[in-house]
Amino acid sequence: MVLEVFPVQATKKEGKFDLYNEIRKLVKENGISLNEGDILVISSKYISISQGRILDHNSIKLSEKANELSREFSINLKLSEAIVRESDVVFGGVSGFVITSSNNIMAPNAGIDKSNSQGKLILYPNDPYQVAEQIKRKFFLDYHVHVGIIIVDSRLMPARIGTSGVAIACSGIEPVSDRRATKDLDGNVLKVTFQATADNLASIANHKMGEGDELLPMAIIRESGAKLTDRKISSEETAIPYDECVYVRGLKK
């Protein structure tokens, strides 16, 4: 069994569109099929664009909280307002960046992307777990194959140069593998080890999809070895309470 990754070429999208139909069209145009057990990894930004989750600077009205955030962290006022709207928790930050959480996703600036949006702000997709679930179900109904779906974003890792992929949502696969009670190479019983299956696969696909102008918003992973499931996955399964997170607890000292 050899893991393979097939990037899916697309054309640039700037407005709302039917995500599922576009995925089907692109997979066919790229000469790829989705087989039983494949994992389809989709860019979170691509999904956001399909939903129209784009803010024009001119449409953003400022709040006092946005003014405070802008002053404290030297952030553009319009971006500050978007961060306030999109965040459940603001942990702190540095000049130009605010560390936030929204729907159990911890990210700088609420995951808002302004790198390729021509002066506009691209927000995280609405209900990403529901989106992943719907795509998985539609592929089964139309093609009678069980596939996994991962929605990927790129993320900075603490004290590391560069970005890597992270799963902000998934469906059809078990997102975490519990390795507790198994043994390591020396025969020691593992007591706390969980393997982040969805995140690991997201990072593999993200490497092939790229971060620039590649126009590769999707990739298909074959022979991943991931465990398939029909149950509905929730964000709580891939996140831990912040009072148990070593990074958050360490920064609060």
Predicted regions and their residues:
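N-terminal and secondary-structure boundary signal
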Residues: 1-253
